[in-house]
A protein has these predicted regions:
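Short histidine/acidic/glycine/proline-rich micro-motifs that form metal-
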Residues: 12, 125, 154-157, 187-188, ...
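Hydrophobic alpha-helix immediately C-terminal to the catalytic Tyr-X-X-X-Lys motif of short-chain
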Residues: 131, 135, 139, 169, ...
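A glycine/serine/threonine-rich, flexible loop-to-helix segment
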Residues: 111, 162-170
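C-terminal substrate-binding subdomain of Rossmann-fold SDR/epimerase-dehydratase oxidoreductases
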Residues: 4, 35-36, 173-264
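Proline-centered turn/helix-capping motifs that create local helix->coil transitions or kinks
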Residues: 97, 106-109, 144, 160, ...
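N-terminal Rossmann-like NAD(P)+-binding domain of SDR-like oxidoreductases, especially those catalyzing
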Residues: 1-155, 195
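Residues that form or flank phosphate/diphosphate-binding pockets in enzymes
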Residues: 15-16, 41, 160, 222-226
């Protein structure tokens, strides 16, 4: 809607639905190819033939629980997939805006991380995203790749996959089931509405210099238990009837918190 031409590439794995794109499929400035980001040669063709200036790399496996059960697909998609994309960018001269995660910093404890802080990923998902970041910066140093790195906090919004926390809460309550809550439920996350992340991304894309890293966050923190209680309050349901405490997951970071002052 802002005059940009957009070319989408999506493998439509279990978490992707073409139906989510129904509002843009008929737009004259939107095109779509269904393929894996591991298809490097096809990516080169798409970028070159469509004169694509920026590749916005959002493709990733992101569910931490799944990464603990089986990390192979996370390494394949998040690391090898990123390598495939930046190989295509280097070959065609395109720049990349790479989406990472606030989880690469590790547990925040009392501080809010800034972009220059060291990375300390503590689960297979965040480790795969940190590895992808290092690939991007290594290609910048070695091959002259131009990039922007974005590290967002927890996003929520329309059409989010049902495995994520807020959709899980809503689905469980709707079905009359209890919401499983890890440990004591006091793990804290920083929440941001997806449209605000989109606005921030556009601002960065239009205003940033090359080879910069940005935290993107709202400053709004809430513990997992309190998120459930808030949803229950909105829906008029007794929170005591909605929560089932379960064994904490391995390596569960207590808190994530990032400082996005650089965007101001």
């Amino acid at each position: 809607n802002n005059g940009y031409g957009v070319y989408g590439v999506d493998a439509f794995t279990y978490a992707g639905k073409k139906e989510n794109l129904k509002n843009v499929m008929d737009k004259p400035n939107f095109n779509l190819t269904e393929c894996s980001i591991l298809s490097t040669e096809l990516l080169k063709i798409i970028i070159k033939e469509n004169d694509i200036k920026w590749v916005i790399h959002l493709a990733a496996e992101t569910h931490v629980d799944n990464s603990i059960k089986d990390s192979d697909v996370f390494l394949r998609t998040n690391v090898n997939g990123t390598k495939s994309i930046i190989d295509a960018c280097v070959a065609t001269g395109s720049k990349i805006l790479h989406f990472s995660t606030d989880e690469v910093y590790g547990c925040a404890f009392d501080e809010s991380f800034v972009e220059s802080d060291k990375l300390d990923p503590r689960n297979p998902y965040s480790a795969s995203k940190a590895a992808a970041e290092h690939l991007v910066t290594s290609y910048a140093n070695t091959y002259g790749l131009k990039y922007i790195m974005v590290r967002p906090s927890n996003n929520f919004g329309p059409r989010q996959h049902s495995e994520k926390f807020l959709p899980t809460i809503l689905k469980k309550i709707k079905n009359g089931d209890k919401v499983p809550l890890y440990g004591d439920g006091l793990h804290e996350r920083e929440w941001m509405y997806v449209k605000e992340t989109s606005k921030a991304t556009r601002f960065i894309l239009e205003n940033s210099k090359d080879n910069q890293v940005y935290n993107v966050s709202s400053g709004f923190h809430m513990k997992n238990l309190h998120v459930i209680q808030k949803v229950c309050d909105i829906l008029g349901v007794d929170p005591q009837d909605c929560v089932e405490y379960v064994k904490d997951r391995p390596g569960h970071d207590r808190k994530y918190s990032i400082d996005s002052t650089k965007l101001n």
